[in-house]
């Protein structure tokens, strides 16, 4: 058992869906998707739906934030992982808990009350901005990009 090789961490409200399964997994050559979300870790129906979108040859692991921090050494040698979180706050909790995240892709954060749109697929509120700033201050490289086939957008949009 060893720590997973996290190729990329991604904030995506939908967690596993078509874009993640077909584009990001292929682009990264990932063989493992780690979904870190307190609800998804225990919600079998949600896991089943996400599992249908995942490629058959890719291992999918569902963990709560606490489990991800405590069990970060419970992965197999050779795991090349795409780590998915629903919010920047979850990514920050992982980093503060000792999970090594070098690069965070901010992909899809849906618009809802209290948020403002900063790109076509990302809306943030004050809590999101604070977590993203803290991640950047901790040395995490931030990337604003929906899919790998398009160039990254200016990350400063996240803080406007």
Located regions from the model:
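Long, hydrophobic N-terminal alpha-helical segment
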Residues: 2-54
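Short gly/pro/ser/thr-enriched loop/turn and capping motifs at secondary-structure boundaries
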Residues: 41-43, 68-69, 90-91, 111-114
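Structural motif
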Residues: 5-9, 31-34, 58-61, 80-83, ...
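Glycine-rich, aromatic-bearing surface loops/beta-hairpins
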Residues: 97, 102-160
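Ordered, amphipathic secondary-structure segments that act as subunit-interaction surfaces
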Residues: 61-107
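Short, flexible loop segments at the rims of nucleotide/cofactor-binding pockets, characterized by
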Residues: 9-13, 61, 119-121
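Short secondary-structure boundary/capping elements
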Residues: 13-17, 63, 127
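Short, hinge-like loop/turn segments at secondary-structure boundaries
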Residues: 51-53, 79, 122
């Amino acid at each position: 058992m060893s720590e997973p090789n996290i190729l990329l961490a991604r904030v995506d409200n939908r967690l596993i869906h078509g874009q993640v399964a077909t584009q990001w997994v292929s682009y990264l050559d990932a063989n493992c998707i780690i979904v870190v979300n307190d609800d998804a870790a225990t919600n079998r129906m949600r896991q089943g739906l996400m599992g249908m979108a995942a490629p058959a040859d890719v291992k999918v692991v569902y963990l709560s934030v606490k489990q991800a921090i405590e069990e970060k050494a419970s992965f197999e040698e050779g795991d090349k992982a795409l780590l998915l979180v629903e919010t920047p706050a979850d990514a920050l909790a992982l980093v503060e808990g000792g999970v090594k995240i070098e690069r965070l892709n901010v992909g899809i954060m849906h618009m809802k009350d209290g948020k403002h749109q900063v790109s076509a697929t990302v809306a943030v509120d004050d809590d999101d901005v604070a977590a993203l700033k803290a991640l950047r201050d901790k040395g995490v490289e931030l990337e604003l990009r929906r899919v790998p086939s398009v160039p990254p957008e200016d990350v400063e949009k996240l803080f406007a």
